[in-house]
Amino acid sequence: MTEWNHILKRKDYAPEEPSRLVVNLIPALEKKGAKRILDLGCGAGRNTLYLAEKGFEVHGIDVSETALKTTKKRLEKRKLKAELVKGDMKALPYSNSCFDAIICINAIYHQRRMQIEKTVSEIFRTLRKGGVFLANFHSKRSSRYGKGIKVEEDTFMDEFGPEKGILHHYVDKEELRKLFKDFEKVNLKIEEEKVDNYLRSRIIAVVEK
């Protein structure tokens, strides 16, 4: 994961403020009495820190040592605690049904389709009954769709810029419904923002086991 170690040294890839998606999920998690949460692909820890501040038992996992070192330093600076592990989201080192919630912000789509399917299988395995999973996905409607080297259907690799060599997989609601077919509840929402002629489109998934 040399690419991610390099990318996550950039300040613009290591923000400290939490994702709005995670902030907005908190009331639902509190209502459910959620306690143990996994930040999947935690990066530099912006959501790990926020969840720890909110009093949750937080676990963070990432493939990048650089990311985990940054997260650890930020936790220590704020005198917060979280269990951090270097690992692969396709083979989570956790027992069955051990998390009340799992979040995955700006991470799950950096894989091939079959790898995403394996990741979702691992998420389902490690979530407790009634547990919640939150993630965002690239939408096929995005202006970025089709840019870079095509590695498979709907998956492209950046050729230039800070994410050179990084995969981006794009989906639509139909694909996500198939992906989450084993979950009891599936809520999908499209969020779009257009600047000049560029459309930023993503799908927010909140699903319950």
PLM feature segments, named:
Residues 1-34, 43-91, 115-118, 132-208:
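Class I (Rossmann-like) S-adenosyl-L-methionine-dependent methyltransferase catalytic domain
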Residues 39:
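Class I SAM-dependent methyltransferase core
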Residues 90-102:
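A short acidic, Gly/Pro-enriched loop at the edge of an enzyme's catalytic core
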Residues 97, 107, 191:
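Flexible loop residues that form catalytic
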Residues 101-115:
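A short SAM/SAH-binding and catalytic strip from SAM-dependent methyltransferases
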Residues 117-129:
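A short glycine-rich, Lys/Arg-flanked "PGG" loop and its adjoining helix->strand segment in the class I
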